[in-house]
Amino acid sequence: MAYPVKVGARERWTFAKIKETLELPNLIEIQRNSYQWFIDTGLRELFHDISPIQDFTGNLILQFVDYSLGEPKYSEDECKERDMTYAAPLRVKVRLINRETGEVKEQEVFMGDFPLMTDKGTFIINGAERVIVSQLVRSPGAYYAEGIDASGTKVYGATVIPNRGAWLEFETDNTESIYVRIDRTRKIPVTILLRALGYNTNARILELFDYDGRIQNTLEKDNTESEEEALVEIYKRLRPGEPPTVDSARNLLESLFFDPRRYDLGNVGRYKLHKKFNHGILTREVDGREEYIRTLTKEDIIYTIKYLLRLMDGEVKPDDIDHLGNRRLRSVGELLQNQFRIGLARMERVVRERMTIQDVDVITPQVLINIRPVVAAIKEFFGSSQLSQFMDQTNPLAELTHKRRLSALGPGGLSRERAGFEVRDVHTSHYGRMCPIETPEGPNIGLIGSLSTYARINEFGFIETPYRRVDKEKGIVTNQVDYLTADEEDKYFIAQANAPLDEEGHFLEKRVNARHGGEILVVPASQVDYMDVSPKQMVSVATALIPFLEHDDANRALMGANMQRQAVPLLRTEAPIVGTGMEWRAARDSGTVVLARNNGVVERVTAREIVIRTDNGHLETYRLQKFVRSNQGTCINQKPIVRKGERVSAGQTIADGPSTDQGELALGRNILVAFMTWEGYNYEDAILISEKLVKDDIFTSIHIEEYECDARDTKLGPEEITRDIPNVSEDVLKDLDERGIIRIGAEVRPGDILVGKVTPKGETELTAEERLLRAIFGEKAREVRDTSLRVPHGESGIVVDVKVFSRENGDELAPGVNELVRVYIAQKRKISVGDKMAGRHGNKGVISRILPEEDMPFLPDGTPIEIVLNPLGVPSRMNLGQILETHLGRAARALGITVATPVFDGATEEEIKEAFRKAGLPEDGKTILYDGRTGEPFDRPITVGYMYMLKLAHLVDDKIHARSTGPYSLVTQQPLGGKAQFGGQRFGEMEVWALEAYGAAYTLQEILTVKSDDVVGRVKTYEAIVKGENVPEPGVPESFKVLIKELQSLGLDVKVLSEENEEIEIKEDDDDVSESAQELGLDVHGQPNTAPESEGGNEEDKEAEADEDFDPADLDPSELELDADLNDDLVVPDEAYGDEE
């Protein structure tokens, strides 16, 4: 039966039966450890590899002696505020030696600012938090494969893949001869390569391979006699068309495989070859320290061929490239090292060139070294690499999962198009290393995964998972834990975590389920070598948060794991009644909660900070984040959960972050649900909710948008941020301060001015009156136009923060920018029809109706149901976890407790029934419900209980959109598409068919002309509507003119004829239209003027022919849709979440 355990700051009753012998590791250590390795070891390796740099004569030598990272210039928060990169200066001590004079110069050289990792495992690049995702790549080493050729004979192949350098491929043909390809060139008999390596006689070659018949076959095809001939033959293949000499051929072969600068197996490659061939070559001594041999050796090539012969004899099996023993992880550290290496190599070239050009006597290290290529390489990696991604910060789980993500995409990895089914599939070696459930749906399925809970990365980048060792002599499962890689694991028999043990650790059953070499077998207990440490060892963090996962279909569990990452942090958080016991670890390691660093007593608590007096008398201050905007526009807000005078211990949670409650992850709310249909409102996954959820702010979330406005220098003079805006009433300016910037706390609606800004306008011809005024008053009539920052369509809220940066105050701004203003607007979004909600079991739906509380079905005691879900959503989807959760949630709520039911080790049906009995509820969990409208009971008992529901980030407020007039595409003159462009709805081919089917001719004509791209017609229509006249006849649509022009450009003379066979002129120019549109304040030509100079209205003396007696001055400006500057501030979000979802 359940027993209580402490999780975070609360107690949960857990149903776990298996004792966990191993603590979960820190969940973001994969990021931290890798970066730490780079700072401590990776950089040193790089400088060691490149040093010394010599000039072409060997006289000057440049050595890199040591390096150090300084202190960052700004703190993390300042970097976010100022759009800076959180980085520390990298200084390198460099020594320049002149061999002739014996002179030595030492200098410390600054090598650029190096981005630092924050405690949370992220980087701050240009003010945005980013994550470097770990990449799964094929490990260097030797790989063997077998296949069948066209004639049906078995053929075999071997490939030696280095970290960088030329590939070496061996293959057989149907005559059982062995051939080799060097760096993807044409194949040659393998004996030619052996001769070139110095095994020059046939006898020596045969002796190497115990006079194997297949080598004899190959020798018969080999037309070379000596080492020299063999070298020349290889040279001809690799460099066709160049005159071959023996020396150049020898140098080529040397540099291809035996020169550490051109060929690198890496420590990993050497280790893999060592393991595969079991030969002794692993390290050699260099400068008194052991180093891995990172190039090929002649022995490696011979062993590779010997192994291929064994494969042909059937002694060994071919390799499986999707096995995690053959795929490794490149984490942050290694990715950075590779990038840095590219920069250093470019720098090395520059140094060599400068050594020859500069005067030897005055030369210093500082002069030689150009750090540009190094800085550029790092900048490029963090800014635009596919693996450097804008952090998903929707909620703490999304952050945590993003840092634990494994991607097979990216440079040096796979591409989406090329990846087949095998790579994407779940593999037996994933067990305990990579989650079989959490992966995106869509084109990236299986290419992006998530690290399992207990997995860790070893020094070679292979994923290891822990197992408890079995003492075979005593037959006891010990608490000693060994971490095994995927290829080591295949050799052992490994029992499951749920195999029953007695107190001492003996297996209770004679035969147990065990995994061995990718198979699941039933073996005698005495044969078992290892045992799983925990049932949740095979799944990732997000999957481990799904209660009753064992009762859900895998496809739905996948959606459940992915949708938890999209849950919006709510205004009032609440931890789940039915959890898995993993919640507090996820919250703690995500870094969104505040932990006490030392033991002590709380001295002072305010909303903004917590002060603790530690046991040794020091005061420690913890600053809390208040209403900060996350990358996804959700709200980050930390709240203290300790009181003054309370005693805290090190590691205790003292403040909750977003989506946490008492130190536990709390992504949603516990809601009373009933599984029943209600008047068809929950047909097809629709959800019916009670108005209580709206009134009591149960699913209310806060969203913060950031708007920015900068004042630049233009050709006509500087822009100015000011309150003095032309043609704007005082009423519109009421919330602006004297600088012209909105005050904090102001409530704003679409179209309100946030920052007043004016831009100088070009000089125009002056009228006689203006010239007279100018002559009298001598002042130039202010020629500026209003380019203020306004609230976009569909947005509103309350201004919560304003930040102003200016050149004068010494802030670093982009070139040409004098002042930058950022305005933050927060909105409270209550749950509304059209919002998407989901449970944790992949049960998602859209809200279709919000019913008054009194109309909802109610329990016998009068409690109204809060959400009504459709029971038909359960059987076909096979996610029964939601039903069990509902039952257990009801019992736990009645007993006043919270429970934990860990994955694969949770509550059984019997235990749930027992909980019902304790709570005095019927065992089937069903209740008679009454209709809230009539008070009549429904005709059968209904399943009712508490389910944990999430509100997802797909909110209807972000998707709803309407347009009257707005920007048009330049070429077709049709309205742009999409909400971001303030576009229209596309009325496509099929929609046209629908109207044709109904014979709605006029509607159709209007849609295809005046509502879209009939440039003349749409202005005249607007005019007619404004004046209340009849709408004129439509003209020729612009896209038709484009079609005609395209046909003419193909050399076809296409004319348009009227009914009377007269040619219709398609005019080039619609100046008159522009003119009348300008008067109307409409912009008819393409995307609204982006260049300030091209203001219309100076078309000299053309009169508006559209309608002489129409005076735009009669119009009230507020009625017009002025869209001159709609596109001026149109920014496409530069981070559309990397290449991920």
Swiss-Prot record:
GO terms classed as biological process: DNA-templated transcription
Reaction catalysed by this enzyme: RNA(n) + a ribonucleoside 5'-triphosphate = RNA(n+1) + diphosphate
Compositional bias of kind Acidic residues: 1063-1074, 1096-1141
EC number(s) per entry: 2.7.7.6
PROSITE patterns linked to this entry: RNA_POL_BETA (PS01166)
Span list, region Disordered: 1063-1141
Pfam families for this protein: RNA_pol_Rpb2_1, RNA_pol_Rpb2_2, RNA_pol_Rpb2_3, RNA_pol_Rpb2_45, RNA_pol_Rpb2_6, RNA_pol_Rpb2_7
GO cellular component: a single term: DNA-directed RNA polymerase complex
Source organism superkingdom: Bacteria
Keyword annotations from UniProtKB, A to Z: DNA-directed RNA polymerase, Nucleotidyltransferase, Transcription, Transferase
InterPro entries from the UniProt entry: DNA-dir_RNA_pol_bsu_ext_1_sf (IPR042107), DNA-dir_RNA_pol_bsu_external_1 (IPR019462), DNA-dir_RNA_pol_su2 (IPR015712), DNA-dir_RNAP_su2_dom (IPR007120), DNA-dir_RNAP_su2_hyb_sf (IPR037033), RNA_pol_bsu_bac (IPR010243), RNA_pol_bsu_CS (IPR007121), RNA_pol_bsu_protrusion (IPR007644)
A GO molecular-function descriptor: DNA binding
HAMAP family membership: RNApol_bact_RpoB
Family: Belongs to the RNA polymerase beta chain family.
Function: DNA-dependent RNA polymerase catalyzes the transcription of DNA into RNA using the four ribonucleoside triphosphates as substrates.
Quaternary structure, from the entry: The RNAP catalytic core consists of 2 alpha, 1 beta, 1 beta' and 1 omega subunit. When a sigma factor is associated with the core the holoenzyme is formed, which can initiate transcription.
Protein name: DNA-directed RNA polymerase subunit beta
Organism annotation: Moorella thermoacetica (strain ATCC 39073 / JCM 9320)
Organism lineage: Bacteria, Bacillati, Bacillota, Clostridia, Moorellales
Gene for this chain: rpoB
